[in-house]
């Protein structure tokens, strides 16, 4: 227990310590200020902008920015889709892995372009080295950069006033990659290599084990992909076992680095926001609410796994475990990590849009699995994905401002800008599109016979497997209850559609809100008239309950049919 507590304190301390310097660095990068990595990034940026030409020089309106983002994502999708279809004909394929089928290639291309990294294939047997390096790993960078760009646009729109432009997508994209994602990923990858993570393009090794059997040991460019997998909150593993595999996550050090890197940029953006709008207390308030939500989720998931089998005491097996005070659920968990390292990792992963796991989610207790679903279903606003976590949280922040202002009889405003009906329409659109997507697709899948055949469990847990898949897809997480055999045409197509709607539907609403906010006047008198202190403890509590009630209750009926009923079936 003391080890678990120390690990928790060190993790939180690390997160707090890196938030200000990294947040300041991100602020400087996107404000064209001098940084200590200019020597590395500027040569890449010059070549990149030279190729783009005039399109990278002029600032864009919110609509123009969105359409540039969308056109880039469409081109990226087509490229990845074609590579996956034709990978059997392409080089760097020593295992002679065949091209994917249409529905699986469609699903995978959508998955990586939307920063979801849902995988209906086994990484080491379904994708060649060429596809891993040129298609999937590249998307890990650019899809993460797209999310960061959207967050930066939203921050700019709050900071600027009486303007029409929100920045240039192509310029922002290069800054996100060359100044932030690429250099940090290189450092992390080097550390991983020294920790024992392979980085090569060798054919798989055939070895004769001490037990007398033959075994195939997969090889590949793992360290480079693993670094951006966590930093970019992508989550798609080189191996089917993801970060439970010793080649992806060999030591307690790599496990810790992965957890910190998942939250690093998302946490830093809270300080970036505060610094940009000239009110760092506002940024720390956002950080604090996120942290409280995270701690509560972690506590519930950890307790449910530590005591997840206590109900078996009533099943007359207490003599077997009589010397143990409680029965912990170690099924599906690496013994080298134990329960707390597993629940900490998976809480981080499902709170962000990462989706990587170091233990099997389908083997968690019903309540443990439910907490993972809730982390995703509330929009992954507990730090969240790179960029996506911030703009998702901002939607709840806007709603809390609106509710709080009306409760005290004041005109809603935030940081001196009037919040009007049109702003709230886009806010609610962003908040409701993913839950609607989850409920509609889950309801349809629940009555499709082919989906039933893809389940390894029936009843409440089987429904939980379906529900988890669409929550994960719609919120661009990518983790899964492995009991669902997802490589069917129906599941590949519908989960891909949920990923597209959940990603670009929300981004569209955020960009429209940004376009509205950037045009508004900033009035110090408006802040005084509103009299709603958005950095106060009371407002923090309001934001907290807005997230819990609006985000949590939206999905509660579905959770009642899944993990909650599953838990009740175990107890009674």
Swiss-Prot record:
Listed NCBIfam families: kdpA
Gene name linked to the record: kdpA
Bilayer disposition of the protein: Multi-pass membrane protein
Domain of life: Bacteria
Gene Ontology cellular-component terms listed: plasma membrane
Keywords for this protein: Cell inner membrane, Cell membrane, Ion transport, Membrane, Potassium, Potassium transport, Transmembrane, Transmembrane helix, Transport
Taxonomic lineage from the root: Bacteria, Pseudomonadati, Pseudomonadota, Gammaproteobacteria, Thiotrichales
Function description: Part of the high-affinity ATP-driven potassium transport (or Kdp) system, which catalyzes the hydrolysis of ATP coupled with the electrogenic transport of potassium into the cytoplasm. This subunit binds the periplasmic potassium ions and delivers the ions to the membrane domain of KdpB through an intramembrane tunnel.
GO molecular function, one term: P-type potassium transmembrane transporter activity
The protein's assembly and partners: The system is composed of three essential subunits: KdpA, KdpB and KdpC.
UniProt-recorded name of the protein: Potassium-transporting ATPase potassium-binding subunit
Any one Pfam family match given in the protein's UniProt record, by short name: KdpA
InterPro entries reported for this sequence: KdpA
Localisation: Cell inner membrane
Residue stretches spanning the membrane: 6-26, 66-86, 135-155, 177-197, 251-271, 283-303, 382-402, 428-448, 493-513, 537-557
Heme as UniProt keyword: no
Similarity remark: Belongs to the KdpA family.
Keyword Cell inner membrane: yes
